[in-house]
């Protein structure tokens, strides 16, 4: 069972937080709400639809952080001759994903921007 202020779907509990934070702070906030809680992840279109239905009345047309980013899986790059990549001439861009609450369209955003978010844990 989900706590009283959380919504239930397919054995998972969800809660919308209309307190804009950056991605890392939102993820940390989620982990502090309940054991096993993280920013929402979608395993099916039905689950995504449920979250859209849940968030729309609270946030209207808005964006919410979801639990996808490239913050922790930067690849170890090396040159084709095997030497390490010590010199970088490109701008490092850390991207995190938001979901549009009206239609679940995913958009990449700068991880330091602030948005509302949805936390989820397995009941």
Curated annotation (Swiss-Prot):
Subcellular location: Secreted
Disulfide bonds: 2-13, 30-119, 96-111
PROSITE patterns in alphabetical order: C_TYPE_LECTIN_1, C_TYPE_LECTIN_2
Keywords annotated in UniProt: Disulfide bond, Hemostasis impairing toxin, Platelet aggregation activating toxin, Secreted, Toxin
Any one GO cellular component localisation term in the record: extracellular region
Gene Ontology MF: a single term: toxin activity
Tissue specificity of this protein: Expressed by the venom gland.
Keyword Disulfide bond: yes
UniProt-listed Gene3D superfamilies: Mannose-Binding Protein A, subunit A (3.10.100.10)
Pfam families, per database record: Lectin_C
Major localization listed first in the record, in broad terms: secreted
Coiled coil: none
Residue ranges annotated for the C-type lectin domain, each copy included: 1-123
Family indicated by similarity: Belongs to the snaclec family.
Function description: Potent platelet activator that aggregates platelets via both GPIbalpha (GP1BA) and GPVI (GP6). Induces a tyrosine phosphorylation profile in platelets that resembles this produced by collagen, involving the time dependent tyrosine phosphorylation of Fc receptor gamma chain (FCGR1A), phospholipase Cgamma2 (PLCG2), and LAT.
Subunit (UniProt): Heterotetramer of the subunits alpha, alpha', beta and beta'; disulfide-linked.
Record protein name field: Snaclec alboaggregin-A subunit beta'
Organism per entry: Trimeresurus albolabris
């Amino acid at each position: 069972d989900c706590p009283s202020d959380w919504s239930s779907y397919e054995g998972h509990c969800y809660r919308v937080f209309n307190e804009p934070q950056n991605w890392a702070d939102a993820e940390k906030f989620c982990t502090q709400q309940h054991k096993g809680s993280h920013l929402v992840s979608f395993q099916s279109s039905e689950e995504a639809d449920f979250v859209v239905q849940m968030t729309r009345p609270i946030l209207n047309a808005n964006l919410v952080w979801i639990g996808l980013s490239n913050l922790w899986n930067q690849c170890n790059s090396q040159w084709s001759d095997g030497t390490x990549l010590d010199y970088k001439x490109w701008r490092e861009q850390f991207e995190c994903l938001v979901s549009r609450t009206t239609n679940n369209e995913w958009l990449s955003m700068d991880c330091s921007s602030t948005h509302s978010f949805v936390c989820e844990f397995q009941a």
